[in-house]
Amino acid sequence: MEVKGEIYRVAGPVVTAIGLDAKMYDLCKVGNEGLMGEVIQIVGGKTIIQVYEETGGVKPGEPCVTTGMSLAVELGPGLLSSIYDGVQRPLHVLLEKTGGFIQRGVTADGLDHEKLWEFKPVAKKGDFVKGGEVLGVVQETVNLEHKVMMPPDKSGTVADIKSGNFTVLETVCTLTDGTELQMMHRWPVRRPRPVKRKLTPEKPLVTGQRILDGLFPVAKGGTAAIPGPFGSGKTVTQQQLSKWSDTEIVVYVGCGERGNEMADVLWDFPELEDPQTGRPLMERTILVANTSNMPVAAREASVYTGMTLAEYFRDMGYNVSLMADSTSRWAEAMREISSRLEEMPGEEGYPAYLSARLAEFYERAGVAETLCGEKGSITAIGAVSPPGGDFSEPVTQNTLRIVKVFWALDAKLSQRRHFPAINWLNSYSLYKEDLNDWFTENVAPDYVAMREKAMDMLQTESELQEIVQLVGSDALPEEQQLLLEITRMIREIYLQQNAFHPIDTYSPFAKQYKIMQAIMKYGDAAMDALKSGVPASEIIKMESKDELPKVKFEEDFDGSLSAVLAKMDKEFAALGGR
């Protein structure tokens, strides 16, 4: 039901209306052009609306109409491979309607209402179906079966259910109380979708990135943050996670970042193969593009839109990874709206409720038993862009209180061309202990011990670096000289990874383990040789050691590694270290 009021005041993206009988979070059409907005505050007879489009030229006295509905997304077949703006308008539809530059007041349906999908019923006539249970299935892509579910807030006995080709608006099921159900339903973005219960994460998200999988793993259903200064590799790391994570669905939210970065994703993903299925990566991806040149207020909507789409697929029992790049831009949008509302500012001008909003977002991630009895997960990975790389600023600090994995990007590493530029001394993962059993069973019994040994060595190296910078490495005892050489190998062979190399971009667990095992084998044999009287300089000069870094780029990895290890054994035997 539409209720009409009029605009009283305009302050940037915030519009105040009078005579509007609206509820909190109702959608409104603002001004003569019908700009989309959302009610964020009601004070006395005044309704305050944040507008998701540019408000230039909107003036007091123009009409303002409430739709009586909250900001909701359309959920149903046809979501995958889509690219939306922050309020689920498909960008290709907007392109057809308005050309390259999006005009104001344009509306578009989130799903294609004309396309036919083959619906196969699962529920039968006479079945009592509760909210979240499966009515039927649609084969959306070659590898993904889209489960058409009863909306979570409805239930009833099936009176009639159809089979065949239908659009998302046609009725496929009728309940005994007369309720007609379609393949599509709408869900408010600010309301988390219900689940039976939350579960403890038990499996790692396999990313194919050695430093992440090996040293700082994130669990499926976990939360992680990637803070870092400009140019340190946040977006490339996020894109690597989008490409190679072993989840069935990836939702990539480009929130206030450059448009070129979304263009990169659109350019690369259709050409890249998913290592799990061999199909184009775009088939499992949904993009929510809310770039830096789009209106500020829509950034907030884009984060909630992305999370609601992720929850929908989680409810089907799929594992979803959600990339938010960058949460700092979302926080800056909150700061702007807050200042327009003349609220009391908190630290650095951010609103006092910043930490509550961030927590609200990350808490919607997790592993859950869904209403249909399946087990699904959402892994939320948020990039943070602190000004000047200052991790003490409010967005980074509030994010670190919430997330369990911290991948700290370091400008100094990126300047040295060490990528991924994740600082192994500042980063941490609180899932390590929970995932140790999985690594022991699925990778190797000595995997955890090897990882801890490597971390201890890297820690010792950082302590020795201060002495080395003062007096040089030659002044150190030979044992410590060897340790520095081994840690250099860990850094350059294991931790460094080329995102743009066709082979090195993705490293399976078996390969990661063998690389680390080879480095440790060299380290143990080198220490034994040193104890038996071989000078450290002789051990460091070995040819096989210098061939080891090339192995990770070879297609025949196992064959190349075996040849290098055999050569290493001969060289150590010649030195008399064994």
Swiss-Prot record:
<dbReference type="InterPro" id="IPR000194">
    <property type="entry name" value="ATPase_F1/V1/A1_a/bsu_nucl-bd"/>
</dbReference>
<comment type="subunit">
    <text>Has multiple subunits with at least A(3), B(3), C, D, E, F, H, I and proteolipid K(x).</text>
</comment>
<dbReference type="Pfam" id="PF16886">
    <property type="entry name" value="ATP-synt_ab_Xtn"/>
</dbReference>
<dbReference type="GO" id="GO:0005524">
    <property type="term" value="F:ATP binding"/>
</dbReference>
<comment type="function">
    <text>Component of the A-type ATP synthase that produces ATP from ADP in the presence of a proton gradient across the membrane. The A chain is the catalytic subunit.</text>
</comment>
<dbReference type="Pfam" id="PF02874">
    <property type="entry name" value="ATP-synt_ab_N"/>
</dbReference>
<dbReference type="Pfam" id="PF00006">
    <property type="entry name" value="ATP-synt_ab"/>
</dbReference>
<keyword id="KW-0375">Hydrogen ion transport</keyword>
<dbReference type="Pfam" id="PF22919">
    <property type="entry name" value="ATP-synt_VA_C"/>
</dbReference>
<dbReference type="InterPro" id="IPR024034">
    <property type="entry name" value="ATPase_F1/V1_b/a_C"/>
</dbReference>
<dbReference type="InterPro" id="IPR005726">
    <property type="entry name" value="ATP_synth_asu_arc"/>
</dbReference>
<dbReference type="InterPro" id="IPR022878">
    <property type="entry name" value="V-ATPase_asu"/>
</dbReference>
<keyword id="KW-0547">Nucleotide-binding</keyword>
<keyword id="KW-0067">ATP-binding</keyword>
<dbReference type="GO" id="GO:0005886">
    <property type="term" value="C:plasma membrane"/>
</dbReference>
<keyword id="KW-0406">Ion transport</keyword>
<keyword id="KW-1003">Cell membrane</keyword>
<dbReference type="InterPro" id="IPR027417">
    <property type="entry name" value="P-loop_NTPase"/>
</dbReference>
<keyword id="KW-0813">Transport</keyword>
<dbReference type="InterPro" id="IPR055190">
    <property type="entry name" value="ATP-synt_VA_C"/>
</dbReference>
<dbReference type="GO" id="GO:0046961">
    <property type="term" value="F:proton-transporting ATPase activity, rotational mechanism"/>
</dbReference>
<dbReference type="InterPro" id="IPR020003">
    <property type="entry name" value="ATPase_a/bsu_AS"/>
</dbReference>
<keyword id="KW-1278">Translocase</keyword>
<dbReference type="GO" id="GO:0033178">
    <property type="term" value="C:proton-transporting two-sector ATPase complex, catalytic domain"/>
</dbReference>
<dbReference type="GO" id="GO:0046933">
    <property type="term" value="F:proton-transporting ATP synthase activity, rotational mechanism"/>
</dbReference>
<dbReference type="InterPro" id="IPR031686">
    <property type="entry name" value="ATP-synth_a_Xtn"/>
</dbReference>
<comment type="similarity">
    <text>Belongs to the ATPase alpha/beta chains family.</text>
</comment>
<dbReference type="GO" id="GO:1902600">
    <property type="term" value="P:proton transmembrane transport"/>
</dbReference>
<dbReference type="InterPro" id="IPR004100">
    <property type="entry name" value="ATPase_F1/V1/A1_a/bsu_N"/>
</dbReference>
<dbReference type="InterPro" id="IPR036121">
    <property type="entry name" value="ATPase_F1/V1/A1_a/bsu_N_sf"/>
</dbReference>
<keyword id="KW-0472">Membrane</keyword>
<protein>
    <recommendedName>
        <fullName>A-type ATP synthase subunit A</fullName>
        <ecNumber>7.1.2.2</ecNumber>
    </recommendedName>
</protein>
<dbReference type="GO" id="GO:0042777">
    <property type="term" value="P:proton motive force-driven plasma membrane ATP synthesis"/>
</dbReference>
<dbReference type="InterPro" id="IPR001763">
    <property type="entry name" value="Rhodanese-like_dom"/>
</dbReference>
<dbReference type="InterPro" id="IPR023366">
    <property type="entry name" value="ATP_synth_asu-like_sf"/>
</dbReference>
<feature type="binding site">
    <location>
        <begin position="228"/>
        <end position="235"/>
    </location>
    <ligand>
        <name>ATP</name>
    </ligand>
</feature>
<keyword id="KW-0066">ATP synthesis</keyword>
